[in-house]
Amino acid sequence: NKVQTVFPIFFFFLLSQKSYFCLKLFFMLKAGVLGAGHLGKIHLRLLDQSDQYELIGFYDPDKKNGKKVESEFGFKFFESIDALIDAVDMVDIVTPTLSHYDCAVKSIKKGKHIFIEKPITNTVEEAENIRALLSVHNLKGQVGHVERFNPAFKAIKYQLKNPMFIETHRLAEFNPR
């Protein structure tokens, strides 16, 4: 009988779909964002749309801006950096470069994976210290060098294997942020 054969398969499919959803929720990293400026809002939106992360919220030292972003976009605003870091598995650091090092060290020492907008820090020594701390604590860290996803780079990828010559131009001034 087809019904007797198909029903258990269909039931298994439904069960496996629900199990997959439950497992996915169980294994999703809880993410938090430090910084709610222009780039911070972009990171918040992208993390919120991701199916790999559960966006827990964000912290911004400017409480007025934090409350504004919370009411405008609906993301939870944490009033202290420690409260946010304690609530997540992964910290996305989108603050001014001068504070990257302190935010990273604080997050790593609390056992959190990190993503840092570029540049990683102001000095090579600070960057090397972050790398060493990540290694000691067996954590993952990544710097936001995302140009590899830029459609222009993707379009010429095949040409890079046998270039005649490559010339690049910077069209905007360096912004130290």
What function would you assign to each model-found segment?
Residues 6-27:
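Hydrophobic alpha-helical signal peptides and transmembrane signal-/tail-anchor segments
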Residues 147-177:
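Predominantly a Rossmann-like dinucleotide-binding segment in NAD(P)-dependent oxidoreductases
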Residues 28-72:
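N-terminal Rossmann-like dinucleotide-binding module
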Residues 43, 73-131:
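Beta-loop-alpha module in the N-terminal Rossmann-like domain of NAD(P)-dependent dehydrogenases
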Residues 96, 119, 144-146, 169-171:
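Histidine-centered beta-alpha loop that forms part of the nucleotide-sugar donor binding/catalytic region
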Residues 56, 89, 164:
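Conserved acidic residues
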Residues 129-146, 163-168:
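Rossmann-fold dehydrogenase core element
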